[in-house]
Amino acid sequence: MGDKPTLVTLLTVAVSSPPPSSPLPLVSFTELLLPPPSVAAAAVAATATSEVGEKTAEQEVAAAGPETRNERRENREDEGGETRTTGTTAVKRSHDGIPRQLAERLRLCRHMDPEQDYRLPAQDVVTSWIEALRDADRDNYGRCVRHAKIHRSASHLTAYESYLVSITEQYNTASNVTEKASYVQGCIFLSFPVIYNNTQGCGYKYDWSNVVTPKAAYAELFFLLCSTSESSVVLQPLITKGGLCSSMAVYDEETMRQSQAVQIGFLHTQLVMVPFVPHACPHYAVPFTTPGKPGCGGAPSGVAGLEETAPFGRVSVTRHGATLLCRVDHLTWISKRVTTYGHKKITRYLAQFRGTMDDDEAALPGEDEAWIASKNVQYEFMGLIFTVNVDSLCVDAEQRQLLGTVATSFCHRVSDKITARNMPRAFSFYLLTSAQRGYDLRFSRNPSLFFSGDALNCPLLNEPNVFSLTVHAPYDIHFGVQPRQTVELDLRYVQITDRCFLVANLPHEDAFYTGLSVWRGGEPLKVTLWTRTRSIVIPQGTPIATLYQITEGDGNVYSYNHHTVFRQMHAAGATTFFLGDMQLPADNFLTSPHP
């Protein structure tokens, strides 16, 4: 326990910077690279033995003591389980006892600091900075105001109208454009040819098509690209910035009958580009759950993935004001698997823990509190990156215990070469706690394990993109059986305002199509995918969908066929726009100027 951290500790455990209110002793990166005395002694003994030439490698290891044998065994595991001895010749080591191959690697990155990705400014500096901004706000009275995400409830077409006219004219002047686009009542209408390929002699209903459209450059301005009801070929809806777009095309029955004899031909689809400005993603938090009570959004009570028969790790919790610093030891990891294409694949690793506050007088988090965790911590094994973070937490007030789980995220692929023995034995994270009422959006689990995007890390980023989140594949998705797959993630949310998430395609994705749908609070997230060919495999960790915040409306996109078109309805002197059975909220889809 008195030795300095070993090299294995450096490579396998990410060090999280403690809060400034409780500073820990700093250890330089050079000190961390120095071997403990036991390893140094073993290295000297090995050098002397090689000069005399009397001891074999096995005798050297036996004489080194159990501590050194364990460290060498860990080094062998860290190198992917390769044998470190051949016959009677030990693996060559550098002068400081580190394997030569590993020493060369460390020499190349010796100037790097693994803590740079986790370093934050001191809390008193941040507090002073915020107070200075408030003082500046008073001086700026009557001028501009600092932006708040929630204050704007709707966008206005008049802010973009001249720009939309400009990009329409720019599109029409291109030499390769044969069908001119027109800007009418806030939308861009255009016609585009679709190649119909029936060389195999049997008509089919689904196809794939690429189209080129006007392109927007504003960060918050997108388009809903879809077909109108006059189209014989219906392009399935996309959320796009414009430019080159790929989507699934659907032919109606009449078009299929008329095109049976045609081998290769052209059909035209009538397209509309509806300006779309999503809401900025609000600040989020995850409520603390309590035993026996339903979680956020109707999620099951307790901790997600908790297994009473599995061993618990031990967590010690230190309170620093509104921040909880958690140190977890003795973790036992459980692999979660799914059967895909006839093979069981690892989807993630999960470990559970429980423990108490270090200070018996410190208060436990209450039911009305919520938390935001520190960022995902990166680990590496055999050159493969994966990330780990806290998943869910439960407070047992009667036992004064904190129960929870840590898990690998879906944002990276978990290789089959990684086993539970390679997972970190200890972990650390911090929680920023505050009252639930201060957050409009509350998830049932840590969204950082499921999504990526600037909106999850706004306080740490300069000019973040707060208009979208990216969903990643939770496992390898095979399309060998059928071209349509639905992926379900056990994640729910509750939102106080009348907003929800729009599940949409990835920009410029042409290998598969993501069906447009609405994800409402209290429901698990479902993503429906189509592929062009059945030989495509989407690896775990691949982005598969994009989430946008919109004002909640009626209906949803329930089917993806020739009825999924843009249409309008007139009633009581008002016009309402629909995409299939989904009503388009006027706050986000700008089809006409707001009064």
Curated annotation (Swiss-Prot):
<dbReference type="Pfam" id="PF04489">
    <property type="entry name" value="DUF570"/>
</dbReference>
<dbReference type="GO" id="GO:0030430">
    <property type="term" value="C:host cell cytoplasm"/>
</dbReference>
<dbReference type="InterPro" id="IPR007578">
    <property type="entry name" value="Herpes_U10"/>
</dbReference>
<protein>
    <recommendedName>
        <fullName>Protein UL31</fullName>
    </recommendedName>
</protein>
<feature type="compositionally biased region" description="Basic and acidic residues">
    <location>
        <begin position="68"/>
        <end position="82"/>
    </location>
</feature>
<keyword id="KW-0945">Host-virus interaction</keyword>
<feature type="region of interest" description="Disordered">
    <location>
        <begin position="47"/>
        <end position="94"/>
    </location>
</feature>
<keyword id="KW-1048">Host nucleus</keyword>
<keyword id="KW-1035">Host cytoplasm</keyword>
<comment type="similarity">
    <text>Belongs to the herpesviridae U10 family.</text>
</comment>
<dbReference type="GO" id="GO:0052170">
    <property type="term" value="P:symbiont-mediated suppression of host innate immune response"/>
</dbReference>
<comment type="function">
    <text>Plays a role in the inhibition of host innate immune system by targeting host CGAS and promoting dissociation of DNA from CGAS, thereby inhibiting the enzymatic activity of CGAS.</text>
</comment>
<keyword id="KW-1090">Inhibition of host innate immune response by virus</keyword>
<feature type="signal peptide">
    <location>
        <begin position="1"/>
        <end position="40"/>
    </location>
</feature>
<keyword id="KW-0732">Signal</keyword>
<keyword id="KW-0899">Viral immunoevasion</keyword>
<dbReference type="GO" id="GO:0042025">
    <property type="term" value="C:host cell nucleus"/>
</dbReference>
<comment type="subunit">
    <text>Interacts with host CGAS.</text>
</comment>
